[in-house]
Amino acid sequence: TFTPNSHYWLGQLYFAKKQDKEAVKSFAAVVSYKDSNKRADALVKLGDIAARNNNATQAKKYYQQVVTEYPNSASAKVAKTHL
C-alpha cells in the first residue's frame, strides 16, 4: 500500500528539518507495517535519530534489528557501518 511509503517520506522530511519527535512517529508507523519495503530503511532512520539525540544504546538496537531481520539488504550494510 501507499500508506507506509507516505509515512516514510514524511519522516524523511521531518528528519531533514530536525523535527525528531515527528520523524519518530512517522518512521515508527512504517515499522508497524511488517511487509513494507521501507521498513528496514525506517529502522535505520530511527537509529539515526537515536544517535543524533545521544542515545547510543537505542541506536544500536535499531541498527542491530535491521542487520538481524534484513541481513542481505542495502539497509543492513548501512546499519553495520553504525555498529
Placement of each model-derived feature along the sequence:
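Short solvent-exposed coil/turn linkers within tandem alpha-helical repeat scaffolds
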Residues: 1-3, 32-38, 67-77
